[in-house]
Design a protein with these regions (language model features):
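Aromatic-anchored segments of alpha-helical transmembrane domains
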Residues: 51-60, 105-116, 164-174
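Hydrophobic cores of alpha-helical transmembrane segments in multi-pass inner/ER membrane proteins
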Residues: 17-29, 80-91, 133-147, 203-222
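Membrane-interface helix-boundary motifs at transmembrane edges
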Residues: 33-44, 91-97, 147-158
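A contiguous pocket-lining binding segment that forms or flanks enzyme active sites
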Residues: 114-164
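Membrane-interface helix caps and helix-loop-helix hairpins in membrane proteins
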Residues: 63-72, 92-96, 116-128
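A glycine-rich, hydrophobic loop/mini-helix early in the fold
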Residues: 40-90
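Structural signature of hydrophobic alpha-helical transmembrane segments
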Residues: 14-21, 66-79, 99-102
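Membrane-interface transmembrane-helix boundary segments in multi-pass integral membrane proteins
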Residues: 5-22, 159-162, 166, 176-215
Length: 233
């Protein structure tokens, strides 16, 4: 069975992904802005459960169609970590999760829409799941800022970059143990991306530079939403 599936730029599924993102975003922001505080809190908890449910059903779906494997199906890509951070914030009210989620989710999610590569196959369900999950990791941190009033720590971009690097060694060792390519630490992604240059291990240095650049730019874009210096997150 096909596992890695690159969605061509400008194809029907590529545009369909952006449509899913737009509808998804419109719905959650409309609910968040129009609901009472109590209703909004219930909605957020259920939103987290839905995100987690999509993950669980995706794993079950792979088991049923025989495509589940240690090499491809473990939730060890950065976008998967972002999904769990979203659940921790929405359902379990863990605000600390927002700092890495804001930077990992928005940057990783954006590139997952721009140059989409499904690592779990090309079935219609897995493509919808791909777009739903990546839309979520963009929308949850944006929702937390524009609906929840959360403010970003001034050094949050450096915190996110630090935890990026903390994950590298354990994920690389897991890759060696199971023969996987989680976080693309063994081989570059198949989808073309201008920030992926060279072979192993040199393209990883490009990942590092691109992450720091993207996080810094995101901090500048959201400069007016930074946490005041004397406040705490």
């Amino acid at each position: 069975l096909e596992t890695h599936h690159v969605i061509p730029f400008g194809s029907s599924w590529w545009w369909g992904g952006w449509l899913i993102f737009a509808v998804y975003g419109a719905v959650v922001f409309w609910i968040g802005k129009s609901a009472t505080e109590a209703t909004r809190e219930r909605f957020e908890r259920w939103w987290g459960w839905v995100i987690l449910g999509f993950f669980a059903f995706g794993q079950f779906y792979q088991v049923l169609d025989g495509s589940w494997s240690l090499q491809e199906s473990l939730p060890l890509h950065l976008c998967w970590f972002s999904r769990f951070l979203a659940v921790l914030y929405l359902t379990f009210r863990q605000k600390w999760a927002l700092v890495p989620l804001f930077f990992w989710g928005i940057v990783g999610g954006f590139h997952s829409f721009l140059t989409p590569e499904s690592t779990l196959g090309s079935s219609s369900f897995m493509l919808v799941e791909y777009y739903f999950s990546h839309a979520g990791i963009i929308l949850v941190p944006l929702y937390s800022v524009f609906v929840g009033g959360w403010r970003i720590p001034a050094n949050g971009w450096l915190q996110a970059f630090f935890w990026n690097n903390v994950l590298l060694l354990p994920i690389y060792l897991i890759n060696l143990a199971v023969g996987g390519n989680y976080m693309f630490l063994v081989a570059p992604p198949v989808a073309e991306n201008p920030f992926v240059v060279g072979e192993w291990p040199y393209y990883i240095l490009g990942f590092e530079a691109a992450a720091l650049l993207h996080y810094g730019v995101l901090r500048l874009i959201f400069f007016n939403y930074l946490l005041p210096k004397r406040a705490t997150a």
